[in-house]
A protein has these predicted regions:
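Compositionally biased, intrinsically disordered low-complexity regions enriched in proline and serine
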Residues: 9-14, 18-19, 88, 94, ...
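Short, charged/polar N-terminal "headpieces" of proteins
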Residues: 11-15, 19-57
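Short amphipathic alpha-helical patches
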Residues: 40, 86-91, 124-129
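Active-site- and interface-proximal helix/loop "cap" or "latch" segments in soluble metabolic
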Residues: 43-109
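C-terminal charged interaction modules
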Residues: 102-140
Length: 140
């Protein structure tokens, strides 16, 4: 199966290449807890996962959550950062997020030639962004 084949599962039934099959699917849960101040600005963000190295709550200073709404064919997004997220860390967070979006798209494209070219353009932009925003340390 290449990256363009879609796997849809509801944790009991799967549809693979439009064929129904019964499989025993593993289930994992990701929990997000956001503490807000009086103006609804995040004070803290904590997350945990039942499928990680630890199930303990882990702190985070920022998060970007994107979901695809298949019914309406659009993205649903939640972008949050805490009051104490330093600007330099936010620049690095954006840079790393852009880089990993390219990695994800590359895996999803299944080696599509046009996608590879576009990913190359994204990598070039990431390098430009890092330089202009002084994200990377010298020699890194």
């Amino acid at each position: 199966m290449d990256g363009r084949d879609w796997l849809y599962c509801d944790y009991v039934h799967s549809v693979i290449n439009n064929k129904n099959c019964l499989v025993d699917m593993k289930k994992a849960e990701i929990k997000l807890n956001v503490t807000l101040d009086e103006q609804n600005i995040p004070e803290s963000i904590d997350w945990s996962s039942t499928d990680g190295e630890t199930t303990d709550q882990m702190p985070a200073k920022a998060m970007f959550l994107a979901l695809w709404d298949a019914q309406y064919k659009n993205s649903l997004r939640i972008d949050l950062w805490t009051k104490d997220m330093p600007y330099d860390e936010m620049k690095r967070f954006f840079y790393e997020t852009l880089q990993t979006l390219g990695d994800t798209f590359q895996r999803a494209s299944g080696g599509d030639e046009m996608a590879e070219k576009v990913i190359g353009d994204l990598r070039d932009y990431c390098a430009h962004f890092a330089e202009k925003m002084e994200v990377l340390e010298e020699g890194a």
